[in-house]
């Protein structure tokens, strides 16, 4: 059985279905988890269910605050070993009906925010000479889906970005991988 004892883990989007399952799994494997999300009630529920978890409300769409956020996370956890970029949104619409804002917002949150989280986490991981990043993408990033051109593009971009980051930092003992789930409830 894998053991994450002593590993400090940041999970974004921790209050949704996949994020919640990740929190539970990492805690069951003795990881030290800091869970983030934008829903205060759900974060409070996580804290009640798992008193030893760290929770922090944070909106990843505010890129100007991501560097300070990572600094805060590493202070709370006393380091950062694993980043799981799970936060993301959908704004489904057929391409001809899709508003510019729907396109931009999905790309901005799913792809751009993930890049900035990786960038600032990698700075910390380089100092520790160790790091693991897992970006939660989607099967839609590989296949496309009706009414999800923005979401598919954002997830495909995450895959390509992750491959590039993996190549850049492999020799520094930092791995970057993707998990592409199918449809969930």
Which sequence ranges carry the predicted segments?
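Active-site loop immediately N-terminal to the catalytic Tyr-X3-Lys motif
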Residues: 96, 143-149, 171-172
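Alpha-helical segment proximal to the catalytic Tyr-Lys
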Residues: 123, 167-171
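Substrate-binding pocket helix/loop in short-chain dehydrogenase/reductase
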Residues: 94-95, 99-107
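The beta1-alpha1 cofactor-binding region of Rossmann-like NAD(H)/NADP(H)-dependent oxidoreductases
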Residues: 58-68, 100
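Active-site helix of classical SDR
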Residues: 118, 154, 162
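Conserved glycine-rich cofactor-binding loop
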Residues: 15-16
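Residue(s) in the substrate-gating loop at a strand-loop-helix junction
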Residues: 138
